[in-house]
Amino acid sequence: MFGPRHFSVLKTTGSLVSSTFSSSLKPTATFSCARAFSQTSSIMSKVFFDLEWEGPVLGPNNKPTSEIKAQSGRINFTLYDDVVPKTARNFKELCTGQNGFGYKGSSFHRIIPEFMLQGGDFTRGNGTGGKSIYGEKFADENFAKKHVRPGLLSMANAGPNTNGSQFFVTTVPTSWLDGRHVVFGEVADDESMKVVKALEATGSSSGAIRYSKKPTIVDCGAL
C-alpha cells in the first residue's frame, strides 16, 4: 500500500523527487482492455505512434522472454478532448507536427517497469527539454481524470502549471500522481497495449533504457 512518504511526482527533469519510491511497493495490476476501455466516457480524437526499438520478445501473457531483437509496432491513443481540450490539442498537434515541430523522431527516454513509460522530449531527449504548441509551458487544465489503471496518458511536468510536451503512459494504477499530473488520454486497444508492454520490458528500475536502440517514434499523426 502506498502512503504519503512514498508519493513521487513525475518530473520533466528525468528523476523522481522522492528517494523513498520503491519498486517493491508498486501495485500489481492485471490489464483487460475490454473491461477498462468499455468504461471510458470520453471517446474523442485518436492519434498514433509508430515505434522501433530493441528489446525482449514477449511470450505468453505478455511476459518478456530471453530473446532480444529489433522490433516495431504501433500504439493508438484516444484523447479526452471534451474533458481537457487544451491538453489534448497540444498532444494531437505534436503528433501531426503541423506547427513545424513535434514527436516524430523522438524517443522514450525513461522507462520504469511496473510504473510508466516517459517520452516527449524532442529537443534534448533526456527529460530536460521539449515545448508545447502554446509556448514553453502551459497551466494544468484540470485533474478530473485519475490515474486508476494501466494504459493512461498523462502529462509529465516540473511542478504545478509547467506542462510542455513531455508525457507518460502508465503500466499500473498510479493514484499517488492524482492532482499533480493531468490525465488526457488512454491507450486505445489491446494490440497497442501489447506494444506498451514490450516497451516496458526495455526499461529498468532507474529508468535507464537497457538496450542500444531506444524506443523511437519513427512516425506519428492523427487517425
Curated annotation (Swiss-Prot):
Disulfide bonds: none annotated. The keyword Protein transport does not apply. GO terms for biological process: protein folding. It comes from Neurospora crassa (strain ATCC 24698 / 74-OR23-1A / CBS 708.71 / DSM 1257 / FGSC 987). Belongs to the cyclophilin-type PPIase family. The gene is csr-1. It catalyses: [protein]-peptidylproline (omega=180) = [protein]-peptidylproline (omega=0). It comes from the Eukaryota. PANTHER family: PEPTIDYL-PROLYL CIS-TRANS ISOMERASE. Keywords: Cytoplasm, Isomerase, Mitochondrion, Rotamase, Transit peptide. Its EC number is 5.2.1.8. Residues 1-44 form a transit peptide. Its main location: mitochondrion. PPIases accelerate the folding of proteins. It catalyzes the cis-trans isomerization of proline imidic peptide bonds in oligopeptides. Residues 62-222 form the PPIase cyclophilin-type domain. It holds the Pfam family Pro_isomerase. One of its GO terms (cellular component) is mitochondrion. It is found in: Mitochondrion; Cytoplasm. This is Peptidyl-prolyl cis-trans isomerase, mitochondrial. It is an enzyme of class 5 (isomerase). SUPFAM superfamilies: Cyclophilin-like (SSF50891). One of its GO terms (molecular function) is peptidyl-prolyl cis-trans isomerase activity. InterPro entries: Cyclophilin-like_dom_sf, Cyclophilin-type_PPIase_CS, Cyclophilin-type_PPIase_dom.
